[in-house]
């Protein structure tokens, strides 16, 4: 599953929820009628008789809220209590349904996660475990030996090469970046 958003808190009493967007194509992914898969294991109730998050949610409406969040209504989610049960659920699409980017310098998160990170001299630094989307630039989260994570700005000056076929990302970090 390619994660396109994370459901946040309910908004109002009619079942709308806030969604933290994790896609470059929110207008497509959250269009009315779009079917989104929920994270594996999301349908485990907190207690017997509690609302079970379905394996799929269908978007009824979506609109921007405060410029950074989407307010989304899903079919069948009609009140605040059910909306509250969705809080924290990741929603996504099947990777098979995602078209490859046409720009050779554009990548989907799932293409980068798991790649080895090496210096231009060939020294292995670790592995990419996730991508954080910050306002200024995306950040590669590099897992170093010893389970220590380092954030690397995904900009050409620091990441001159992405070799998907070779399973690696070449970095040229400025002094001290890997020590943070």
Swiss-Prot record:
Pfam families assigned: PRC_RimM, RimM
GO cellular component: cytoplasm; ribosome
Database matches in InterPro entries: PRC_barrel-like_sf, PRC_RimM, RimM, RimM_N, RimM_N_sf, Transl_B-barrel_sf
Superkingdom of the organism of origin: Bacteria
Keywords per UniProt: Chaperone, Cytoplasm, Ribosome biogenesis, rRNA processing
Gene Ontology MF: a single term: ribosome binding
Subcellular location per the Swiss-Prot or TrEMBL entry: Cytoplasm
Primary location recorded for the protein, binned into one broad class: cytoplasm
Protease found in the keyword field: no
One GO BP: rRNA processing
Domain PRC barrel per the UniProt entry, residue ranges: 104-177
Subunit structure: Binds ribosomal protein uS19.
Function: An accessory protein needed during the final step in the assembly of 30S ribosomal subunit, possibly for assembly of the head region. Essential for efficient processing of 16S rRNA. May be needed both before and after RbfA during the maturation of 16S rRNA. It has affinity for free ribosomal 30S subunits but not for 70S ribosomes.
Family membership: Belongs to the RimM family.
HAMAP family: Ribosome_mat_RimM
Domain characteristics, as noted in the entry: The PRC barrel domain binds ribosomal protein uS19.
Name the UniProt record assigns to this protein: Ribosome maturation factor RimM
Organism of provenance: Salinispora arenicola (strain CNS-205)
Lineage: Bacteria, Bacillati, Actinomycetota, Actinomycetes, Micromonosporales
């Amino acid at each position: 599953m390619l994660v396109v958003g994370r459901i946040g808190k309910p908004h109002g009493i009619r079942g709308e929820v806030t969604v933290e967007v994790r896609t470059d194509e929110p207008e497509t992914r959250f269009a009315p009628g779009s079917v989104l898969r929920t994270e594996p294991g999301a349908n485990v109730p907190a207690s017997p008789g509690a609302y079970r998050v379905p394996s799929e949610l269908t978007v009824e409406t979506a609109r921007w809220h405060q410029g950074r969040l989407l307010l989304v209504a899903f079919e069948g989610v009609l009140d605040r209590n059910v909306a509250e049960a969705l809080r924290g659920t990741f929603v996504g699409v099947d990777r098979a349904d995602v078209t490859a980017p046409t720009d050779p310098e554009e990548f989907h998160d799932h293409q980068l996660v798991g790649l080895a990170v090496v210096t231009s001299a060939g020294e292995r630094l670790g592995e990419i475990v996730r991508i954080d989307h910050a306002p200024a630039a995306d950040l590669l989260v590099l897992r170093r030996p010893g389970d220590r994570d380092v954030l690397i700005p995904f900009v050409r000056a620091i990441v001159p090469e992405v070799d998907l076929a070779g399973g690696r990302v070449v970095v040229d970090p400025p002094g001290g970046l890997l020590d943070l």
